[in-house]
């Protein structure tokens, strides 16, 4: 299992290089399953908007699959190298993933060796718990189960600055999880959690 987690994924040059350097092959050769955030619509999926966005990071268009929350079954058994979930509202994106059954599929993919790239919301979703994110993502989209996918057994404080130090310290004090802070230019690799 390999997770590459960051605050800004490809939106920050340092993070983008870190991600590319930690893939199993050149980014242009990787087959990726991209998960849009909570603002997704069926029309946006069909428009090619998401393929263009992901291609701008170096993936080849013919290697990009965009997860369709409205028709998920064709995406459950793909031959892919990477799963990529970027930023947005953590709760809204996780709700879409759960409601469509992709939560189990993502865990299965990662357990079979597919690399997970998570940026901001996507990074939080990979963790054990997202409840602390409600301070930053105000709309929880009606979620009552705040467990993440559990790929990483700890939790993250993304977009870490001195403004979030008190939150980081409080989470550490509680001692429920390992807590890692990530500034916008930072990324981490987690293997075999």
Regions found by a protein language model. Name each.
Residues 8-12, 61-65, 93-96, 135, ...:
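Short, flexible loop segments at the rims of nucleotide/cofactor-binding pockets, characterized by
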Residues 1-82:
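N-terminal beta1-alpha1 cap of cysteine-dependent amidohydrolase-like domains
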Residues 5, 34, 66, 118, ...:
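Structural signal for conserved beta-strand scaffold positions within catalytic alpha/beta enzyme cores
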Residues 41-43, 92-95:
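A generic structural signal for short coil/turn motifs at secondary-structure boundaries
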Residues 85-86, 94-115, 122-193:
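Active-site-adjacent pocket-lining segments in enzyme domains
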């Amino acid at each position: 299992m390999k997770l590459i987690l960051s605050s800004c994924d490809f939106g920050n040059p340092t993070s983008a290089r870190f991600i590319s350097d930690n893939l199993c092959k050149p980014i242009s050769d990787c087959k990726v399953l991209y998960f849009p955030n909570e603002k997704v619509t069926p029309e946006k999926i069909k428009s090619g908007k998401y393929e263009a966005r992901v291609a701008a990071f170096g993936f080849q268009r013919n290697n990009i699959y965009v997860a369709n929350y409205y028709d998920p079954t064709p995406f459950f058994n793909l031959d892919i190298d990477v799963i990529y979930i970027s930023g947005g509202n953590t709760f809204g994106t996780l709700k879409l993933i759960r409601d469509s059954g992709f939560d189990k599929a993502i865990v299965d993919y990662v357990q079979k060796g597919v690399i997970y790239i998570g940026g901001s919301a996507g990074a939080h979703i990979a963790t054990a718990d997202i409840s602390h994110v409600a301070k930053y993502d105000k709309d929880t989209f009606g979620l009552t189960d705040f467990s993440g996918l559990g790929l990483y057994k700890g939790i993250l404080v993304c977009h870490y600055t001195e403004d979030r130090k008190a939150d980081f310290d409080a989470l550490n004090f509680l001692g429920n999880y390992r807590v890692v802070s990530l500034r916008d230019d930072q990324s981490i690799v987690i293997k075999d959690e």
